[in-house]
């Protein structure tokens, strides 16, 4: 957010607190003087509580901007400038003030809201009254040597905490006295840097309605600039002290009205700007964490600040109205000359913004709870060193702050001096030196992420994994380490119902519905405090209520840095008695049901020490080292709940004294939001009942007061129905995110010792028959006698954990349960994590032939171990034989719970488990047995056959897979609608029903079957022997065939060689006998070669021819011709 928008919000809040005195708690008109409520941005309202939507206020702002253009830079947020000037001692004039204002970071929304209370508390501080600037008071720095920090004694520190706590009650009286004193004094000449500003403002009129902010700047010898605010009367130009004294009572009522207006105005602005506050607070938390790590580097700087702190008041020529005196010294003739030896102006915290401080008080160490970067490293030692350093700073300031002679002047109306140690501590936490920002190493914990594209805003970094677009790159170890600490600091809040619903966790109280309920409850109590007697202040009491730091004591390892034998300053045994006076909380649900929460309600928080006007507004870091160690341990474990909650927090009797209102909380801090109150549950467990906190539930007692909110309440009570008066809607759970079938089959967490069940549909029908008058939900509910019941961690550790690494169960699609059984519905489970989990379990393959695990009903993971949910198993209808593991140990792969097939187990997608822990069916039956008044024991039924409880059903045709039997009505085709609605007794559900075969009942048939099996085995062995013999014969014949084939190949090769040789001989013969002609034949050639050779053969074989003298010469010639041919 820009500095302009931040400046606008800050100025409008401060001006709202300085409204007219007539706007008391009953008069709800516009706080802008002269505004009738018309022309507002929110046109549907006839009034408003904020100046943001007032057109008259905007018009006056524009007029003021024209007159203040010379000092526009100096008019950034007054509190921020005052805090920054108080923390950094490096400014020496108005130029430094302007540089500071430009360099102020707008990331710290939390300290800004906390500082606004201090601004509103400075109602008694100085304002220039006339243009001349004459002063009646001269502060003397040289005449009072006791104003140095070395003048304080150690005895002042013992009563300083109690004085601070009790002095906050009289801020209205201080404001009244400051208004009386304001008219009797004027301001002397200021330094030349601001004279022009004061003259311009005096020209515009000293009776400005919006309370201008002025800078009182010390001369060059004092390096401190303080911006203060002043209350101005709405009456034109007050002229005498008598006029102001006549309006003292009305002024005091006006201050109280403004305080109440500030609270409700802040609630409106929180609803409008929650997203911006979340972003700003995350940046602020990062700064605070890094600055506390660098506290040792700034120790020198803080010592210089403490030495220069008493010189905050301005130089010799600069005077103003002093308010360091106690309330008795404000009156009478001392108005014109208060004692000037008090030379330190500090910021006073007012009750007006006590709701912001009470939120940080609930978590006991809100400043330290932001340091989750060190939490992930487990750096407990560094936290304790930081806390010890703060304790030393507080002691050093308190021991050397003020002389004992001035302790007598400290009254209940002077929180100024005693708030100085808090100021010094605050300096070390909220210092905003721009040079420190460059030293930080702020980057996204996601590997490879540079901070761009985050959901949480445009700033280039973040310190949490929520909102990171590259969340799929995060290893499961880092994800689990970060997500486990990102929890809401409000005790009992799981992060649900927050305005920023895109994140399942948050680190601040803004947007938390439980914190909003506490704030509204506190406003009701303030109305009671206005009408009642103010509590007496005890300035001498050294016992003040510290914020309760609830730590798991048994889990804290013994550290050498703390003393286990030293008790804290305020014993926890007596804390309940002290809180007993202030713990009565009364709310009217009709006044805030739809405006605060919309359509969803969570249980309101228990009011503890923040409701007390005596509550100390800051954590005491210096009581002992043991509390420091407890605080550090609580910081490292943000999931710490109220383990040491006192059981009696109120003395008001309950409407139903026979029942104790219990809030059932498991170890994750999830409340039981069910509206169901069952008779049998009350009889079985008389000490347990559900805490009804739905504002949408109306009773006839308050129906006339809720006529204006009936429409939003009816839509909140049941989004599925527009009738809020239906009887069956009284007992429905608040969660309607699941359909009715899903809610019936949801694996519910159950335990006989402490029950936190959401009512099912079967419960609704039976409970709807109860008498309407027995259950009363009064409009004003007083939360008393709370007993927080935590479920056994040994049993719930396996039952209530999400398999996704780093998931605490919040934000699931399945509803408001603290856990779930599968990755489906988990917002943290993405494809990368599922693939990673599937890769680590490579043996998890679907037993269906040809199934690769895709298309399963149980999820999109790549494998499963059972046929249920497999689409291919249903199509084929085959019953697959058990795997090798099942054959080796069939008992190992079966769930001992009757009727359980291994689905939905926490241990994963396995088809079996060895115990009932993690079995959703066992949890469901345990709940049914508890509701029916009978106990459930799965071990006694380990060997029973699973059968369908529907009468006449043999298990066939079920919709939940290929199994023959089942133990629930879901998926049974023979179960009618009435049968589903009706309840079965525990005996009927758990009764053994064996269906034995007729074959197994006759021993003769068994023997006959065994004989047939033996005969078949013998015949099989004979056939196997014949088969072996045939196989041997076939192998020999194959060998002979191969030999014959080899011989044929050799013969073919020889034939080819002979053919080639014959061809050569024929060609040689043709060439030799080409010139020789036989009688009656043509010359030899390839065509007549065969005939020619036959003729020659006949001639040589025939002796007659051969001896014939005619043929003898021819034959000799032929011999000579063929003699050269070699064969």
Curated annotation (Swiss-Prot):
Keyword DNA damage: no
Assigned GO CC terms: nucleus
Keyword terms of this UniProt record: Developmental protein, Differentiation, DNA-binding, Metal-binding, Neurogenesis, Nucleus, Repeat, Transcription, Transcription regulation, Zinc, Zinc-finger
Protein name (record): Myelin transcription factor 1
Pfam family, one: MYT1
InterPro entries reported for this sequence: Myelin_TF, Znf_C2H2C, Znf_C2H2C_sf
Biased composition (Acidic residues): 104-117, 260-308, 761-772
Composition bias type Low complexity, residue spans: 143-157, 703-725
PROSITE patterns: ZF_CCHHC
Job description of the protein: Binds to the promoter region of genes encoding proteolipid proteins of the central nervous system. May play a role in the development of neurons and oligodendroglia in the CNS. May regulate a critical transition point in oligodendrocyte lineage development by modulating oligodendrocyte progenitor proliferation relative to terminal differentiation and up-regulation of myelin gene transcription.
Basic residues bias spans: 41-50
Ranges of Basic and acidic residues composition bias in the record: 61-71, 82-103, 244-259, 348-360, 726-735
Residues reported in the UniProt entry to bind Zn(2+) 4: 802, 807, 820, 826
GO biological-process terms attached to the record: cell differentiation; diaphragm development; endocrine pancreas development; intracellular glucose homeostasis; negative regulation of gene expression; nervous system development; positive regulation of gene expression; positive regulation of transcription by RNA polymerase II
Region (Disordered): 1-157, 204-369, 520-542, 670-776
Binding residues for Zn(2+) 7: 948, 953, 966, 972
Binding site for Zn(2+) 6: 895, 900, 913, 919
Keyword ATP-binding: no
Entry superkingdom: Eukaryota
Subcellular location: Nucleus
Record's compositionally biased regions (Polar residues): 528-542
Zinc finger (CCHHC-type): 21-64, 435-478, 479-522, 793-836, 837-880, 886-929, 939-982
Tissue specificity statement from the Swiss-Prot or TrEMBL entry: Isoform 1 is more predominant than isoform 2 at all stages of development and adulthood. Expressed in differentiated neurons especially at higher levels in newly generated ones.
Binding site for Zn(2+) 5: 846, 851, 864, 870
Positions bound to Zn(2+) 3: 488, 493, 506, 512
Binding annotation for Zn(2+) 2: 444, 449, 462, 468
